[in-house]
Amino acid sequence: MSYYIPYVIERTGRGERSYDIYSRLLKDRIIMLSGEINDAVASSIVAQLLFLEAEDPDKDIYLYINSPGGVITSGMSIYDTMNYIKPDVSTICIGQAASMGAFLLSSGTKGKRYALPHARIMIHQPLGGAQGQATDIEIQAKEILRLKKILNEILAENTGQSVKKIAKDTERDFFMSSEEAKEYGLIDQVLEKSAR
């Protein structure tokens, strides 16, 4: 199913200019991460983060997240870029932040991680599958366990929880309300009104 991307028209003293809504939001340093996180989505998010840093390295960037998660390596490219650039990255969950979406939500600048009142946040261990020869399956299993360890350590750092607690809580899907995610340390505040 396809959907229409709205255009907005700005009127200035020099005339009119139309933008697709996402380009217009980018002018206000807002990036939308919606849907499954894959290489194409990650490349777009990374490019926007780098562009906004080049525009003004001292102004915050706002990353709005409504995502069921996705590919770990794609999400890690966004995570690494968020940490690489100079501007603070404020994360805001709208709708849901699950799996890698929740990981990125928790990875915003401390004190600037938010969720709307009815958002849902879910953390769990990495998912994967392997096929082929026994040796290939063993290689894939070792890699997913390595990624699980890295993700658990980063989530522990982001939330203030112990790695042991993160490992236990992510053993299965662990859903939270916005308030519960705040208590857990995934976010800093539940927003009733815009923080901007």
From Swiss-Prot:
Catalytic activity as recorded in UniProt: Hydrolysis of proteins to small peptides in the presence of ATP and magnesium. alpha-casein is the usual test substrate. In the absence of ATP, only oligopeptides shorter than five residues are hydrolyzed (such as succinyl-Leu-Tyr-|-NHMec, and Leu-Tyr-Leu-|-Tyr-Trp, in which cleavage of the -Tyr-|-Leu- and -Tyr-|-Trp bonds also occurs)
One Pfam family per UniProt: CLP_protease
Keywords: Cytoplasm, Hydrolase, Protease, Serine protease
Bilayer-crossing regions: none
UniProt-recorded name of the protein: ATP-dependent Clp protease proteolytic subunit
Subcellular location: Cytoplasm
Annotated function: Cleaves peptides in various proteins in a process that requires ATP hydrolysis. Has a chymotrypsin-like activity. Plays a major role in the degradation of misfolded proteins.
Gene it is expressed from: clpP
Alphabetical list of InterPro entries matching this protein: ClpP, ClpP/crotonase-like_dom_sf, ClpP/TepA, ClpP_His_AS, ClpP_Ser_AS
Description of how the protein assembles with itself and partners: Fourteen ClpP subunits assemble into 2 heptameric rings which stack back to back to give a disk-like structure with a central cavity, resembling the structure of eukaryotic proteasomes.
Family: Belongs to the peptidase S14 family.
Top-level enzyme category: hydrolase
Enzyme Commission numbers on file: 3.4.21.92
Main location: cytoplasm
Claim: Phosphoprotein is one of the keywords in the record: no
GO biological process, alphabetically ordered: protein quality control for misfolded or incompletely synthesized proteins
Catalytic site positions: S99 (nucleophile), H124
GO molecular function: ATP-dependent peptidase activity; ATPase binding; serine-type endopeptidase activity
Gene Ontology CC terms: cytoplasm; endopeptidase Clp complex
